[in-house]
């Protein structure tokens, strides 16, 4: 919301009350409580007829400082509330001096000044990183609609850039944007977002989580160009400042606080193919797709049935359409015999035509209006109603239906929708409708996730989810929603993926080839390269199929090449996935996250790091023209083997079987021996590639097992012209390729052979000494 009108005025109809002076400070257990008045109250006359703000400073985890600014403490505060991991024994320090009161957790402290002018500062090791000054936080009375708000404005420094706030498709850097965290079904081409997360981070190495599930209004360097303003309709405002000091460290602490991304099963990293949305399909159509992929040697790992596996007008009652799929169990059994995993589409709504609608209504499993009638409308399905997942019995009914599908052979669910949740309703458990609007996405996906956890096991659980709220990163995978079939939408999708990664989500996908309309073949091929160098890869459309031969023969070559490449990259990719699970670092990440000290990376949103070591720059033109930036160092193309200097921009042109994929120097990269499946023994026949190891540096490569744990570690250390290689753990028949090195002066512990990419060394054991 806009509060100010320029620099000196406020918006018509608003009354503002600010904390201006500290009146008193107390220590209450591990909290520091500050009482602040909106005027000078040193004289008793001014201590009457005045509001008094209560500010509570506390720490739910080390290096996280919570701030709660309260006006009326007696206001209703119904749930839901974010499921945060709050620790009770965090060590804090509270200091009360003549000049200030300071609350400290780890390296982060909040300092409130005493005296004539109000000041709230956040400091890292005593150095200010942000804060708010006089008249930049407080209470807003809106006489236009008789609503009351709390707001805060935190300072932005010169050159400070803001990221996150969920999966947003606008410019990656949020500066200058107005953001309302209200889940909407708006596609990828608008300011709306399926996944609104009231958390942002900046390139100064800290993050801020606003702890309100309802709509939070952000003015990011917009209303006040050197401030991030956030406001909420409430009698209190609670937020957490999370220290880094690096972007990775911020996400580590944030996801420790809100939940780590679960580790998806290895098979989910393979290629997914769908029926598409409104296309005509039955078992014969499905088999033609799957057999067509096999005939063309196109690896395929997951097949997805979209909405029309159920009867029209009845979604979602979880009954297969008997006319289209008369033998679903047999069909699934036959498909799984071909080595496929099966996914089916669901959502949290039900059409009035369904035979079970009356039962659900009578049992109270559907969302009601305050007068007791069902909430219904005719969008999406006629007479559509919404499952009330605050009712435990409704959850059990829904879960039992899903368990029946799992028993039939379904492996996972596409949890679509969950954004257009109304507020003129009465929830079974009395939840606040404003808060439940966004939080519904969490309880919906949590319910489905728990079904899979209880049936196939957590190590096999995976969703394909569209909506999300804070904490929903625990239930991967998420995809970017409905995009158009053009380069602009492809770029929008990438921005959304980078944005959600900066918001705590580790795994992300998008509709390869675009969802709406049908892409020209050149767009499809470029998108396939990008999609198969994403954490998860799915071919999906709306009114047309996405099998590659529907475009041209070369599309088959592109899908084959990049699917096989991804399968070979799985030792590297799954180790990065395990790190996302352990630390919250997304697999696909903005350049600024990996290179926070390089200011040239701050605004880059057409390229990304795939894990720690590989830079990918998708091509967004038919001709193949692409520009990209490489940070400091010497970079090598993953398969072309050309080397480029960093700290500069590069311009190239690529065919459809290529794009810029560069590996940074001092990298030891593991490639597997299987180009047909993502799930195999990655420690057997592993081909390690050593890229530009510099004198005095060490490269370490950890090869994961199926559970993400490290089964084998290879280290290469260079001193002068000598490289010492040592392996520990379990590995069979591994090799080491010295990229762009064709000859060595000495080799101990193995044999050597030439290759196009460099000298390949086969060890006799697990130790090598190489003299360059």
Predicted regions and their residues:
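Aromatic- and carboxylate-enriched substrate-binding clefts and catalytic-loop regions
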Residues: 70-72, 81, 299-559, 594-598, ...
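N-terminal accessory segment at the very beginning of proteins
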Residues: 1-262, 266-268, 274-276, 281-291, ...
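N-terminal small/glycine-rich loop or linker at the start of catalytic domains
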Residues: 262-276, 373-386
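Short, hydrophobic/amphipathic alpha-helical packing segments
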Residues: 155, 175-178, 193, 287, ...
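Beta-sheet entry/capping signal
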Residues: 64-65, 109, 119, 198-199, ...
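Internal mixed beta-strand/loop scaffold within catalytic domains of large alpha/beta enzymes
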Residues: 130-132, 176-189, 194-195, 482-506, ...
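Catalytic core of carbohydrate-active enzymes
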Residues: 449-462, 468-479, 492-496, 500-510, ...
């Amino acid at each position: 919301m806009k509060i100010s009108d320029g620099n000196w005025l406020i918006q018509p109809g608003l009354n503002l009350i600010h904390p201006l002076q500290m009146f008193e400070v107390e220590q209450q257990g591990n909290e520091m409580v500050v009482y602040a008045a909106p005027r000078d109250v040193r004289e008793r006359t001014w201590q009457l007829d005045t509001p008094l703000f209560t500010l509570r400073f506390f720490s739910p985890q080390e290096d996280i400082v919570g701030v709660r600014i309260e006006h009326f403490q007696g206001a209703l505060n119904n749930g839901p509330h974010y499921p945060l991991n709050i620790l009770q024994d965090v060590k804090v320090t509270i200091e009360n001096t003549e000049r200030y009161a300071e609350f400290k957790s780890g390296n982060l402290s909040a300092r409130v000044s005493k005296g004539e002018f109000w000041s709230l500062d956040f400091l890292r090791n005593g150095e200010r990183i942000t804060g708010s000054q006089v008249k930049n936080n407080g209470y807003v009375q809106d006489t236009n609609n008789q609503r009351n708000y709390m707001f805060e404005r935190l300072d932005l420094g010169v050159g400070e850039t803001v990221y996150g706030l969920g999966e947003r498709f606008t410019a990656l850097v949020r500066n200058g944007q107005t953001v309302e965290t209200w889940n909407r079904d708006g596609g990828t081409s608008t300011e709306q977002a399926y996944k609104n997360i009231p958390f942002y981070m900046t390139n100064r190495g800290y993050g801020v989580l606003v702890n309100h599930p309802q709509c939070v209004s952000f003015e990011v360097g917009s209303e006040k160009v050197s401030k991030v303003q956030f406001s909420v309709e409430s009698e209190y405002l609670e937020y957490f400042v999370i220290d880094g000091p690096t972007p990775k460290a911020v996400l580590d602490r944030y996801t420790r606080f809100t939940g780590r991304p679960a580790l998806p099963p290895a098979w989910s990293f393979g290629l997914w193919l769908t029926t598409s949305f409104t296309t005509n399909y039955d078992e014969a159509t499905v088999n033609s797709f799957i057999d067509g992929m096999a005939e063309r040697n196109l690896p395929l790992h997951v097949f997805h049935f979209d909405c029309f596996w159920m009867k029209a007008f009845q979604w979602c009652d979880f009954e297969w359409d008997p006319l289209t799929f008369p033998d679903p169990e047999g069909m699934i059994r036959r498909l799984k015999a071909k080595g496929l995993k099966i996914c089916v589409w669901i959502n949290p709504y039900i059409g009035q035509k369904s035979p079970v609608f009356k039962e659900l209504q009578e049992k109270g499993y559907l969302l009601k209006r305050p007068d007791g009638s069902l909430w219904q409308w005719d969008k999406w399905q006629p007479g559509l109603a919404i499952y009330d997942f605050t009712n435990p019995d409704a959850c059990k009914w829904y879960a039992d239906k899903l368990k029946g599908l799992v028993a039939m052979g379904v492996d996972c669910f596409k949890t679509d929708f969950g954004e257009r949740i109304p507020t003129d309703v009465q929830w079974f458990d009395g939840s606040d409708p404003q808060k439940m609007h966004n939080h519904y996405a969490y309880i919906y996906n949590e319910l489905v996730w728990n079904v899979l956890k209880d049936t196939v096991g957590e190590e096999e659980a995976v969703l394909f989810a569209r909506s999300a709220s804070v904490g929903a990163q625990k239930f991967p995978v998420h995809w970017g929603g409905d995009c158009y079939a053009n380069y602009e939408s492809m770029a929008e999708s990438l921005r959304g993926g980078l944005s959600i990664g900066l918001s705590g989500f580790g795994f992300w996908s998008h509709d390869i080839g675009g969802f709406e309309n049908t892409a020209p073949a050149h767009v499809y091929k470029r998108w396939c390269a990008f999609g198969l160098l994403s954490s998860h890869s799915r071919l999906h459309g709306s009114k047309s199929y996405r099998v590659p031969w529907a475009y041209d023969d070369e599309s088959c070559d592109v899908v084959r090449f990049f699917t096989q490449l991804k399968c070979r990259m799985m030792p590297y990719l799954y180790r990065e996935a395990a790190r996302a699970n352990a630390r919250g670092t997304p697999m696909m990440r903005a350049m600024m996250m990996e290179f926070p000290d390089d200011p040239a990376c701050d605004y880059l949103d057409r390229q990304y790091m795939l894990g720690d070591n590989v830079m990918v720059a998708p091509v967004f033109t038919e001709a193949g023209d692409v520009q990209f930036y490489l940070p400091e160092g010497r970079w090598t193309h993953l398969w072309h083997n050309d080397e480029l200097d960093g700290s500069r921009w590069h311009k190239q042109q690529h065919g459809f079987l290529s794009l810029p994929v560069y590996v940074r120097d001092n990298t030891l990269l593991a490639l597997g021996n299987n180009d047909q499946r993502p799930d195999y023994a990655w420690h057997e026949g592993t081909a390690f590639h050593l890229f530009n190891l510099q004198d005095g540096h060490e490269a370490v490569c950890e090869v994961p097992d199926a559970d993400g744990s490290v089964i084998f570690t290879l280290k290469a250390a260079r001193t002068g012209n000598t490289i010492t290689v040592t392996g520990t753990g379990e590995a069979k028949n591994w090799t080491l390729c010295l990229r762009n090195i064709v000859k060595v002066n000495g080799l101990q512990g193995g044999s050597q052979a030439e290759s196009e990419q460099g000298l390949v060394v086969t060890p006799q054991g697990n130790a090598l000494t190489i003299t360059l």
